[in-house]
């Protein structure tokens, strides 16, 4: 059984660990950037909205990237333009409101102002814990962020962490060096 599972996993890796996969997946958004902060922010937002139909996710991601971020996620967060969405309860994407987006941006703003990048912020948020536990401790108060008791929400955040931490893939970035892939 173990060998059969290993072979199946290797076949899946061969299918999805290719550059062609990027075009039709939410990971395309952070792949548009080269700056660490832009990759982190774009990746976190892309994983946050990764609920539902892939085409709808990509359409919404494009809207965020082009209309809100103006292709500069880090600059957008530091500009504080997102503050205008405080208390706005209308729909941002599916079951997320504009106020949810505001809270996410506010948390990202604090992370970048205090530590310069999200990786460092997570390292300082708790003295110990897995990357997922650290991510949850910082972003868990936001609608749609990981509740460690919810496998579906944790799955999205594990996807984001894999993108940032895993180093042996053309799909993933491996830009976070303070965490080891074994911790995923």
Which sequence ranges carry the predicted segments?
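HhH-family (HhH-GPD) DNA N-glycosylase catalytic core used in base-excision repair
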Residues: 1-184
């Amino acid at each position: 059984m173990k060998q059969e599972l290993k072979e199946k996993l290797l076949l899946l890796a061969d299918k999805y660990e290719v550059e062609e996969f990027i075009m039709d997946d939410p990971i395309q958004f952070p792949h548009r950037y080269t700056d660490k902060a832009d990759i982190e922010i774009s990746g976190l937002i892309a994983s946050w909205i990764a609920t539902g139909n892939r085409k709808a996710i990509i359409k919404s991601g494009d809207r965020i990237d082009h209309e809100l971020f103006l292709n500069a996620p880090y600059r957008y967060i530091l500009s504080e333009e997102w503050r205008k969405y405080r208390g706005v309860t209308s729909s941002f994407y599916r079951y997320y409101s504009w106020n949810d987006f505001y809270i996410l941006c506010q948390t990202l703003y604090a992370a970048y102002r205090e530590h310069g990048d999200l990786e460092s912020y997570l390292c300082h948020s708790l003295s110990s814990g897995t990357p997922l536990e650290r991510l949850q401790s910082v972003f868990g108060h936001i609608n749609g962020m990981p509740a460690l008791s919810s496998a579906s929400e944790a799955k999205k955040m594990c996807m984001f962490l894999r993108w940032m931490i895993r180093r042996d893939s053309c799909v993933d970035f491996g830009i976070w060096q303070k965490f080891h892939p074994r911790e995923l």
